[in-house]
Amino acid sequence: MSVTESRTPFNSSLRWNAIQRIARQQARDSLLGWSLYLAAAIAVLIAVILVYNSIRFVGESGLNIVLRPFFLPLQAALSLALLYITAEAALAIARPREQGALQVLFFAPIDIPVLVGGFFLAGLLVYVLFLLLIVPVLLILAWITNFVVPTGLLWGLVPTIFIAGVTIAFGLFISAAAPSARSTVLLLVAAILILLVIQGAYAALLSIPPTNRFYDALLFLRVFLGSIQGLLSWVSPFRMLDIVLAAALRGDWLNVLQLVGIAIIGTLFWLAASVWAMRQRGVLP
């Protein structure tokens, strides 16, 4: 059943005020809940484990330095942040629609673009809150372990907000298009697993030495997955996160700006797809 949108005329000021109200309410619910803090604690725990492994490696190998010691812990923490906000966005529409609460919102003077925009802005606010929770702890961890955190890596946190926008918009599209909250979760998990399996399989194939007897036999598969990996660098948020942080670390800001532009285009595409899907799917369970 398609949704019936409000016929009240909107101007840009009214739309923006409505988007802000929805975003503040959603962000407030996340701030007062427990899932945000649990996800942040897990992200910090993963970073601590990775830092501990680096320290242990230095002690056992006798090395005095480690290349990019804080890159992997920060990348892992931010990847978990992206997973969290994507899951939140994926349930933002599907869950209240399944509960019958979504249709109540349309008694207020809002329409579908305003609702999607409010959920999108809320996701960005939650991501920034996530950063504010984990980054100070990671800096304290770096100070305790005497690991240097390059300034470029910290500046690289700013463009990750645009990458977060892609994941939020994609999550909203799944939420708007899926028939139920359960199917939303299944679709999201399937998409994430496909991305991780492709990247993991390609990394495993690259680790096979040329002297291995299966090296030539796997050439076609290696080239095929390499092509997909190249495509993922333009569409996968996790791959984009890796490239953005690496580019920021070496000071290649032109590459960062290119990826930010790609992220903005992807965000606009998925937001438009979310509005279309919600108009097709409607607000009723």
Where in this protein do the model-derived segments appear?
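Aromatic- and glycine-rich beta-strand/loop motifs that create alpha-glucan
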Residues: 1-41, 278-284
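Central hydrophobic cores of alpha-helical transmembrane segments
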Residues: 41-43, 184-195
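Aromatic-anchored segments of alpha-helical transmembrane domains
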Residues: 46-52, 141, 191-201
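Secretory targeting signals
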Residues: 49-54, 59, 63-78, 121-184
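Terminal transmembrane helical anchor/hairpin motif
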Residues: 57-60, 197-275
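Hydrophobic/aromatic residues in alpha-helical transmembrane segments
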Residues: 82-89, 137, 169-173, 186, ...
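Helix-loop-helix units of permease transmembrane domains in multi-pass membrane transporters
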Residues: 91-124, 128
